[in-house]
Amino acid sequence: CGSCAVRVNGIEKLACKTNLNENDFIEPINNSNILKDLVVDVSHETLLISKLNLSIDANIESIQVSQEDVKNIDLQSNCILCNSCYSSCPVYEVNKEFLGPFALTRALRYVNDKKNANRLNIIDSIQTNGVWDCTLCSACTLVCPQGIDPKADIMQLQNISVQNGYSNPYTQNFDFNSFGDDFGGFNPNGF
């Protein structure tokens, strides 16, 4: 169910599925307020997800959905809300307004749903504190007990964003010519 997520020797784990050794160090997951002992408050993460207004506006009745289409949204629906991904995320650690791995994975689930007429609104809602803020470090992917790959999901959302006219705001004003003709004395072609 995800309610028993903890950190064991600094790595996010589900307590119910982890065999402990005598010297293991157990602590609450990171980036959440501790309520008591190993129990943390996850209400802020729930609030972030609600900001995305993830719902299906299924007014597109003529669209056929294949088994492949169902498969494309199935994995993102398997999250057990353990918050291990938020605990391991270096961006969420410094920016609590960052939507985070789970919210973005869930956004992809709704964006990939062909019957959802609300897809463009969701893509718009993930541009600020969202897809472009992720460092793509894979920390979330490594700790997910369900085998979900938030990093790949975020990369897919970045591609979908570009296809819909958005761009990475952190590279928009970057001057790629500032390196000069020879990359500051280094020639990548070896000439």
Where are these regions (language model features)?
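Hydrophobic/aromatic-rich structural module bridging two neighboring secondary-structure elements via a short loop
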Residues: 1-30
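Ferredoxin-type iron-sulfur electron-transfer modules in oxidoreductases and energy-metabolism complexes
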Residues: 27-30, 38-191
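A short acidic, often aromatic-flanked loop/helix-cap motif at beta-alpha or helix-coil junctions
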Residues: 34
